[in-house]
């Protein structure tokens, strides 16, 4: 059954309806419309945990999308999928690519920080204190930038920075 017929999530349906209206009203090229359609399908598949399908749609959207800002969100969402799959190195690559195109993407900065923090915890478990300190410092740097861009977000990160004297 096509995704459009089985999507019963109200928010996804609302987003889809609004997106369809905007695509019809705004002066956009066919290429831009196609790119956005693939992006929207990718988001829908991702929200349902269908990551392979989401990736296929995101890669198609990326092939068509020329706007750097819009591409940043495609890269970011691909990074989210790799994070969910435990592929942290690949996720970092995509988060960095998102930031190259849109340096004001606090959620990408936050996710990079989360990965470095996780790696720092792993280093502690493996008895690698120096490596853990370096990883925690990197996490702190990314969290500080994310918080600078979105001061009311990332409360847990703000608390961690205070508790570890890294603020």
From Swiss-Prot:
GO biological process: photosynthesis
Coarse class of the protein's main subcellular location: plastid
Alphabetized Pfam families for the sequence: TPR_1 (PF00515)
InterPro entries associated with the record: PSI_Ycf3_assembly, TPR-like_helical_dom_sf, TPR_rpt
Topological relation to the membrane, as annotated: Peripheral membrane protein
Keywords, comma-separated and alphabetical: Chloroplast, Membrane, Photosynthesis, Plastid, Repeat, Thylakoid, TPR repeat
Subcellular location: Plastid, Chloroplast thylakoid membrane
GO cellular component: chloroplast thylakoid membrane
TPR repeat extents: 35-68, 72-105, 120-153
Domain of life of the source: Eukaryota
Family classification: Belongs to the Ycf3 family.
Role of this protein: Essential for the assembly of the photosystem I (PSI) complex. May act as a chaperone-like factor to guide the assembly of the PSI subunits.
Name of the protein in its database record: Photosystem I assembly protein Ycf3
Organism: Pleurastrum terricola (Filamentous green alga)
């Amino acid at each position: 059954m096509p995704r459009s017929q089985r999507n019963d999530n109200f928010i996804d349906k609302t987003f889809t309806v609004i997106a369809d209206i905007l695509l019809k009203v705004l002066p956009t090229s066919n290429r831009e419309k196609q790119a956005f359609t693939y992006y929207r399908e990718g988001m829908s598949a991702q929200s349902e945990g269908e990551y392979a399908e989401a990736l296929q749609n995101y890669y198609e959207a990326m092939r068509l999308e020329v706007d750097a800002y819009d591409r940043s969100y495609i890269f970011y969402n691909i990074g989210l999928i790799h994070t969910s799959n435990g592929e942290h190195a690949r996720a970092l690559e995509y988060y960095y690519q998102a930031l190259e195109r849109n340096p004001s993407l606090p959620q990408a900065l936050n996710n990079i920080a989360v990965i470095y923090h996780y790696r720092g915890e792993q280093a502690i478990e493996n008895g690698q204190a120096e490596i853990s300190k370096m990883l925690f410092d990197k996490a702190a740097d990314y969290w500080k930038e994310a918080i600078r861009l979105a001061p009311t977000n990332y409360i847990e990160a703000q608390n961690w920075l205070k508790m570890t004297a890294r603020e």
